[in-house]
Amino acid sequence: MFRQSKTIITKLTNLSFQGSWRSRGSSAVEKALKYTVGQKIHNFTVKEVTAVPDLFLTAVKLSHDATGAQYLHAARDDSNNLFSVLFRTTPMDSTGVPHILEHTVLCGSQRFPCRDPFFKMLNRSLSTFMNAFTASDYTMYPFSTQNAKDFQNLLSVYLDAVFFPCLRELDFWQEGWRLEHENPTDPSSPLVFKGVVFNEMKGVFSDNERLYAQHLQNKLLPDHTYSVVSGGEPLAIPELTWEQLKHFHATHYHPSNARFFTYGDLPLEQHLQQIEEEAMSKFERTEPNTAVPPQTPWDKPRMDHVSCRPDALAPDPVKQNTLCMSFLLGDITDTFEMFTLSLLSSLMMSGPNSPFYKALIEPKIGSDFSSSAGFDGSTRQASFTIGLQGMAEDDTETVKHIIAQTIDDIIASGFEEEQIEALLHKIEIQMKHQSTSFGLALASYIASLWNHDGDPVQLLKISESVSRFRQCLKENPRYLQEKVQHYFKNNTHQLTLSMSPDERFLEKQAEAEEQKLQQKIQILSSEDRKDIYEKGLQLLAVQSTTQDASCLPALKVSDIEPIIPYTPVQPGAAGGVPVQYCEQPTNGMVYFRAMSNINSLPEDLKIYVPLFCSVITKMGSGMLDYRQQAQRIELKTGGLSVSPQIIPDTEDLDLYEQGIILSSSCLERNLPDMFQLWSDLFNSPRFDDEERLRVLVMMSAQELSNGISYSGHMYAMTRAARSLTPTADLQESFSGMDQVKFMKRIAEMTDLTSILRKLPRIKRHLFNPENMRCALNATPQKMPDVAAEVERFIGNIAGNRKERKPVRPSVVERALGPEAGAAATRKLISEAHFKPCQMKTYFQLPFNVNFVSECVRTVPFTHADYASLCILGRMMTAKFLHGEIREKGGAYGGGARMGGGGLFSFYSYRDPNSTQTLSAFRGGVEWARAGKFTQQDIDEAKLSVFSAVDAPVAPSDKGLGRFLNGITDEMKQAHRERLFAVTERNLIDVAGRYLGIGQQTCGVAILGPENESIRKDPSWVVK
């Protein structure tokens, strides 16, 4: 997977920390503290042992005696153990060699020579995460699992893959690039470029924001590895040879150039022994020549320009330009300076109280900040970028002037103390909040700094940095202003990069690709052509052969826990509103949710619900204007959010609950403040500021438009499903292409008064305690206080309570659970007369890849066949569709899955094909109906399904399934038993009965470039 350099990797405020989950007599944390500096363990030497109480862990730093490999172990009482190995990969061209290598090492190794052990292990393990990332200057291979045996299995596969890969030429052709006949079996069909990474990168550069971010980095840091595209520039990829790939592996994938990281409660000695025996003992030290030198600073600012494709869904078609100024900062190994600059970046541009928000967003010059804006600590020297997307070309000079003026204003005025406190409170919340994938977050958080020989342990001492930051401010009130003066005002290493759409952009890309193709073809001899044809057949034969994977380790179905852990909840009520209390070790946090149905909302207002949800917490309430409200939310909570929720019934596909969910969290001490903020939103929301609404509408429309090229498969699945169930129909309105186009129309309106007037009407129906139920997760000690505060909150909002008739008369009541009491019911809408119908929709978009989906209406969650369809989807993906769609078809991804709403969905992602992929979906059904699978295939599919079913759940989210969907632990256990019981006969039966042609109604949708054959086919609706 190509990971673009962005703040996701190192930005502190993106890391959700996780508190101690379990108490033990002798915990992993305590045991690790007993290691001593200089201690030898399996040819590793302990260099440092550090308690990190902020994160409830002990950090043990080691180095390997023979190779010098660096090792960090984070011992913590968390059963979701993680391993990661990182190599510094610094390419000097844009052929994508580190990215193609990342794909190819996972295609088979010395001990595990079968093709594609990585994808095969997804189905032979209970992993909670398995992947690999190529960043600008490193490649990382992480996995996590809760099962100790599984950890050892995966560690063996990962170590062998990275250090002893086969790197077969056939795998290079498949994963990287190749010249091949369009139809490999027909030598008269034209020669074309194929390859998984080749198509993936074409898809990446279909996304204007990704394109811009890539150029920004290349041009800001032009001296060394950051001047090239590590993921591969599509037209440079065909310059890479197999020999160059093997050479890059030999020079970069060595323990002397590696950083190992392990996390969790498994014993460190065990990891070290296995790593030493299976990999390290076979190597000697080398001197890797992979360091990135500092960029030579410029003596004057530079400007540059880049072109992109037009955006058919842009909120304002005449405002499609992007302009940013990017400043090169200091070395990321200076952890405290980077901590300060990361906070400074947030103060400068996060939220409506920040100076750049006021200066750039509120005047409505652009639709939003560029997604490249902010602090980026993923390269050796960090950078800060500020600028806009969705702006007019004429405003270029204005924006430059505003940025310069705002920097001057910050130097003159600084920041309010309350803004700084709000930001430090955010850090405190994130240190308390518990995520389920903390090991992975930690591995990503330290990756860039450690990659450049910084101290990863220092980076984890967050409280120390906060204290030092406070001290610096105390000693020098102009501390931050002086940083702004130094890094922004006086910094000559700054780049101004503009981007504008070119109507012929995709056409020019296609022409350039054709030109590159012809260059390659023209130099081919008749021998070469014959060779290409034969190699194409050879690859196809290998792809079509069932692989013997018996060399790979695997868990057995008997390794899966037969019984789920029970989550106790206490039902109650506050002021007549049902409340679910769930006592959990939340580490001093309180989590609040409320579900409110929208059954009484008039039909004409329904399409506005997502807009209402996105603006209601951002327009002010009570005595607070929107700026004061934002400040208060930051100071007292982990955020307030409102989002639409459509929940299918577990027994009937024509029943569903429609509503909104309110979510927030806070530190225990701020509980009254959090509920006061909600009370103000219920009692006195502000709907009087049209200018504020316009800003929010533009940002929302831009975000939706930007998201399509990244999440195209989700939009395709949502659209394909819309005509199959009432739930899916409403889902398309709320979160599909219908909503994207609706928001574009609103963004184009010159007068939003009519929209503004609708918001109070919607609020009366949505913020009605009569339709509400609440859920709270907190520590047992705090729960009495929580109950009292909820009671007070419901009392405060009682004036909004009104019994309103549902718009649709057919309402079915379902109890929330056996012990919830008569009052606690969910009011579901019944559409018994809904008629599913066949529909094929094509969205023509300026992309150069497709997103394809087909959906079939099947059965609800509690139906006896639901479990079989879950197993079938996973098995079909691993054993048939992966080979057809990715290996042969060249798409980045694809598969099939069973959804909770009773829909069986096929999909492909960044796919060079369109209707051919629909044929592959059908082929998958025929493969299953013919029973062309083994008991081993079924067992592997079960392991894969259970790894998702048993994924860790954070204390903040325990009991949510029951609260939202009415799915009790008993129902989960029954589903579990049905999954265990699935047989070959069941799978053949459900494939024929539900997925066979003509058996059930299906819907199809494709998002992709212009397609002449579909346009001429009357069975398709072209949008």
Curated annotation (Swiss-Prot):
Q: Tell me the enzyme class.
A: hydrolase
> Which cofactors does this protein require?
Zn(2+)
The cofactor remark states: Binds 1 zinc ion per subunit.
**How does its record describe regulation of its activity?**
Mainly exists in a closed and catalytically competent conformation but a closed-to-open switch allows substrate entry into the catalytic chamber. Substrate binding induces closure and dimerization. A disulfide bond may lock the enzyme in a closed conformation preventing substrate entry into the catalytic chamber, participating in redox regulation of the enzyme. Inhibited by metal-chelating agents. Inhibited by nickel and zinc excess, and slightly activated by manganese.
Q: Provide one Gene Ontology biological process annotation.
A: proteolysis
Which coarse location class describes where this protein primarily resides?
Answer: mitochondrion
Q: Transit peptide: give start and end.
A: 1-62
Q: Where in the cell is it found?
A: Mitochondrion matrix
Q: Where is the signal peptide?
A: none
Q: Which residues pair up as cystines?
A: C114-C551
Please list the residues that bind Zn(2+): H99, H103, E200
User: What does the record give under GO molecular function?
Assistant: metal ion binding; metalloendopeptidase activity
**Catalytic site positions:** E102 (proton acceptor)
Q: Enumerate the UniProt keywords alphabetically.
A: Disulfide bond, Hydrolase, Metal-binding, Metalloprotease, Mitochondrion, Protease, Transit peptide, Zinc
Q: How is it modified after translation?
A: A disulfide bond locks the enzyme in the closed conformation preventing substrate entry into the catalytic chamber.
Which Gene Ontology terms of cellular component type are present? mitochondrial matrix
Please state the Enzyme Commission number of this protein: 3.4.24.-
What InterPro entries has UniProt attached to this entry? Metalloenz_LuxS/M16, Pept_M16_N, Peptidase_M16_C, Peptidase_M16C_assoc, PreP_C
| Source species, domain of life | Eukaryota
Q: Which Pfam families match?
A: M16C_assoc, Peptidase_M16, Peptidase_M16_C, PreP_C
Instruction: Briefly state the protein's biological role.
Output: Metalloendopeptidase of the mitochondrial matrix that functions in peptide cleavage and degradation rather than in protein processing. Has an ATP-independent activity. Specifically cleaves peptides in the range of 5 to 65 residues. Shows a preference for cleavage after small polar residues and before basic residues, but without any positional preference. Degrades the transit peptides of mitochondrial proteins after their cleavage. Also degrades other unstructured peptides.
* Similarity section: Belongs to the peptidase M16 family. PreP subfamily.
Q: How does it assemble?
A: Monomer and homodimer; homodimerization is induced by binding of the substrate.
What is this protein's record name? Presequence protease, mitochondrial
Instruction: Give the organism, scientific name.
Output: Danio rerio
The organism's taxonomic lineage, starting at the top: Eukaryota, Metazoa, Chordata, Craniata, Vertebrata
